Amino acid sequence: MMENFKHTTVLLDEAVNGLNIRPDGIYIDGTFGRGGHSRLILSQLGEEGRLLAIDRDPQAIAVAQTINDPRFSIIHGPFSALADYVAERELTGKIDGILLDLGVSSPQLDDAERGFSFMRDGPLDMRMDPTRGQSAAEWLQTAEEADIAWVLKTFGEERFAKRIARAIVERNREQPMTRTKELAEVVAAATPVKDKFKHPATRTFQAVRIWVNSELEEIEQALKSSLSVLAPGGRLSIISFHSLEDRIVKRFMREQSRGPQVPAGLPMTEAQLKKLGGRELRALGKLMPGEKEVAENPRARSSVLRIAERTNA
């Protein structure tokens, strides 16, 4: 039975405004979650508008299925496959906007049974879709110490990655960890210097979650796919919550806004330059949550919204 965990959508109005909704447009909410963005998009669409929502979390799908609206459809799957979903519906190049709200949601964090949080004891799972792939416990029990250390360093920016990885492997040899509390305790014991403002397991849990769900690869693939999916003038509106996510989004928008880089002085005809193509996107800037939103929803503090528009190139 699914409990009703509270979820406050971050940068709700700003992210939807970033799509520049047309009443008859076709939009994608790639991270349905609990439907905050989707419901606002639907409220701005006319009868001819359409909204395609995507989520890989079965609990999110259950919520989406309660929306009885002929303009709305939900897909159970990763947003990295959005180009396939669009192609199946013969909508390639016709999408007027894509919204992505990256990372883990409040209901996922707050539900101990999902295994995302070191603050609540539950099964050491961390999968966005619990029906697919390895759980965090399974991966930590089979991975090499060097691989665990690399994940903690790369995706958690954990300075004590090697020490923590060694402690995890040693603990799993004695008795395999299956609970979030066990992992949090092992990490805390292996961390020689504590940050008084942050739990010692914060970075480890983030890193393992990102790895288990292939989160950064998912983002990169979705961004790449957006170029073929969006119509000219179509918008990308993307919310990220930590520097690794935001770095990928920022770099993609910057690179696609530049167009092909030609070395200075290289002799090229006008026809050759045209063949290289122009800018794919026009970056429209970024927004951060205001003081009022952060006060009402502390989890919004680290969020960044970046918006870009597909060019006619």
UniProtKB/Swiss-Prot annotation:
GO cellular component, as recorded: cytoplasm
Record GO biological process: rRNA base methylation
Location of this chain's protein in the cell: Cytoplasm
MF terms (GO), sorted A to Z: rRNA (cytosine-N4-)-methyltransferase activity
Keywords, comma-separated and alphabetical: Cytoplasm, Methyltransferase, rRNA processing, S-adenosyl-L-methionine, Transferase
Major location (coarse): cytoplasm
Reaction catalysis annotation: cytidine(1402) in 16S rRNA + S-adenosyl-L-methionine = N(4)-methylcytidine(1402) in 16S rRNA + S-adenosyl-L-homocysteine + H(+)
EC number(s) per entry: 2.1.1.199
Binding-site residues, S-adenosyl-L-methionine: 35-37, 55, 79, 101, 108
Lineage: superkingdom: Bacteria
InterPro entries: RsmH, SAM-dep_MeTrfase_MraW_recog, SAM-dependent_MTases_sf
Family the UniProt entry places it in: Belongs to the methyltransferase superfamily. RsmH family.
Function description: Specifically methylates the N4 position of cytidine in position 1402 (C1402) of 16S rRNA.
Protein name: Ribosomal RNA small subunit methyltransferase H
Protein source organism: Salmonella typhimurium (strain LT2 / SGSC1412 / ATCC 700720)
Encoding gene, per UniProt annotation: rsmH
